[in-house]
């Protein structure tokens, strides 16, 4: 019985492709997962699963190959008349739009008004003003509107419809890419879960001499890290003072000062020297 759900059908086809690539062990691993119940014989979808397993690989993956062979759809240009800063107050936006409209029609009118009255509210016309880009964008939009005639607008209806169709195609293409990415992530999780982590393979052997009595311990990564840090600290010991002569002079001064302090001096009481002289 073929499933009615399109997404479920795609999941079964993708699972079949992976099982054909990785063998029966992959199928046995998926039996433990309830999401792949169609692998079990008592499941209603097992017949459809078996049918796909018996089909050639090219037939099963034909739709995927056709999807991958589709050409890349170029990103459509941004909307010209709806891309502007939305963080501007309504009053300021009206002033900018009205000024841009007059400027696109005849910029001399606006320039005369600025030179005559020195209107401070039109500072956004200066290139250093934060709203200058918004002003120039609206000027370009109004110039584009004024450049079209009635006949050209009638002729451009077909172009507008074609652009809308291409934009819709691009959006659908982006949605398909997102779905493919999500499906790939899910399959990677399935493949990771199917790895027999409880089974190991012997890669190599190493022998220890029989006369060995003391075995070296395993590497202590923490000690290795500390050892490197200590080695780096020793680099500071080799740095000499910026002024070696000043250091030598200061060391000599300290030594002399230490000698003078080291001599013992006898401090006499007040008038003791005078009394000794009078006795003589």
Swiss-Prot record:
Residues 246-261, 269-280 have a biased composition (Basic and acidic residues). GO terms for biological process: mRNA cis splicing, via spliceosome; mRNA splicing, via spliceosome; U2-type prespliceosome assembly. Changing residue 168 to A: In SPP91-1; corrects the PRP9-1 growth defect through partial restoration of splicing and by a complete reversion of the pre-mRNA escape phenotype. Gene3D superfamilies: 6.10.250.1320, Surp module (1.10.10.790). It comes from the Eukaryota. Keywords: mRNA processing, mRNA splicing, Nucleus, Repeat, Spliceosome. Pfam families: PRP21_like_P (PF12230), Surp (PF01805). GO terms for cellular component: catalytic step 2 spliceosome; nucleus; Prp19 complex; spliceosomal complex; U2 snRNP; U2-type prespliceosome. It is found in: Nucleus. InterPro entries: SF3A1, SF3A1_dom, Surp, SWAP/Surp_sf. SURP motif repeats lie at residues 11-49, 95-135. Residues 53-72, 246-280 are annotated as: Disordered. The keyword Kinase does not apply. GO terms for molecular function: RNA binding. Present with 2490 molecules/cell in log phase SD medium. mRNA splicing factors, PRP9, PRP11, and PRP21, are necessary for binding of the U2 snRNP to the pre-mRNA in an early step of spliceosome assembly. Belongs to the CWC complex (or CEF1-associated complex), a spliceosome sub-complex reminiscent of a late-stage spliceosome composed of the U2, U5 and U6 snRNAs and at least BUD13, BUD31, BRR2, CDC40, CEF1, CLF1, CUS1, CWC2, CWC15, CWC21, CWC22, CWC23, CWC24, CWC25, CWC27, ECM2, HSH155, IST3, ISY1, LEA1, MSL1, NTC20, PRP8, PRP9, PRP11, PRP19, PRP21, PRP22, PRP45, PRP46, SLU7, SMB1, SMD1, SMD2, SMD3, SMX2, SMX3, SNT309, SNU114, SPP2, SYF1, SYF2, RSE1 and YJU2. This is Pre-mRNA-splicing factor PRP21.
